[in-house]
Each structure stands twice: as structure tokens, then as C-alpha cells.
């Protein structure tokens, strides 16, 4: 039996953009949304769902997509820059060590309330 009140979405690149789009349009349907290096869809400035993004070191998001430091505090959002991890390292092109680092960050966010 699925706990439909605790759904979590996660996506990489365009999948991350779609995750943020879903969080914008249907915030009541998910508890958390995780993006890995999306670039175009603005992260909604909201307390629900909880939002988290891991950022590669080689591409910047478009202007206004990521929250400011003040917005991160206000809305309990997290933006984590991964030094030495590129956009394509976040998928099958990454090393085991890079994937372990990504998984550690994601697991930590998933256990936060």
C-alpha cells in the first residue's frame, strides 16, 4: 500500500525542470521535490513541497531559477553545489564516488523533516 501523502519527485536535467513544474502546478500532491542540475524551470518559492536541488559545477541555471540565500532560508529550500561533479556525471557518466556523493546528499534531504 502506497502512502500517497508522502510522494517525492526527483529528476535530472529536463526531468528536474519537469519536477519543478509539477511542484509549481500541484504542490498539494507531493511532500518533496528534488532536482539534479535543472536549468530553466523556476523553483517555486513555497514551503510545500520541500524543495532541494543539487547543482553540477559546469552549467549555471537561467536567471531567477534558483532561490536567493534569503529565499532558501524563508522557504526552507536547499541548493547544494557539487564541486567536481558535472552535469553529465550525475547520470551514467559519473564515477561510483560521484554517485555515492549524490546519494548521500539525497538521503540526507529525504530524512529531514
Task: Kindly give the residue locations of the regions a language model identified.
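The feature captures the conserved acid-bearing segment of alpha/beta-hydrolase catalytic domains
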Residues: 32-92
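Gly/Ala-rich beta-loop-alpha elbow adjacent to hydrolase catalytic centers
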Residues: 11-15, 19
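Gly/Ser-rich "nucleophile elbow"/oxyanion-hole loop immediately N-terminal to the catalytic nucleophile
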Residues: 1-8
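Conserved hydrolase catalytic core segment
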Residues: 21-31
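Catalytic active-site module of serine/aspartate enzymes centered on a nucleophile-bearing elbow/loop
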Residues: 94-113
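Alpha-helix C-cap/termination motif
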Residues: 25, 72-74, 112
Amino acid at each position: 500500500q502506497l502512502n500517497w501523502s508522502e510522494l517525492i519527485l526527483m529528476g535530472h536535467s529536463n526531468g528536474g525542470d519537469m519536477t519543478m513544474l509539477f511542484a509549481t502546478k500541484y504542490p498539494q500532491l507531493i511532500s518533496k521535490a528534488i532536482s539534479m542540475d535543472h536549468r530553466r524551470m523556476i523553483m517555486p518559492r513555497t514551503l510545500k513541497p520541500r524543495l532541494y536541488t543539487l547543482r553540477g559545477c559546469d552549467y549555471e541555471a537561467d536567471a531567477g531559477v534558483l532561490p536567493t540565500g534569503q529565499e532558501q532560508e524563508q522557504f526552507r529550500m536547499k541548493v547544494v553545489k557539487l564541486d567536481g561533479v558535472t552535469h553529465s556525471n550525475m547520470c551514467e557518466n559519473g564515477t561510483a564516488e560521484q554517485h555515492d556523493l549524490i546519494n548521500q546528499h539525497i538521503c540526507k534531504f529525504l530524512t529531514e523533516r
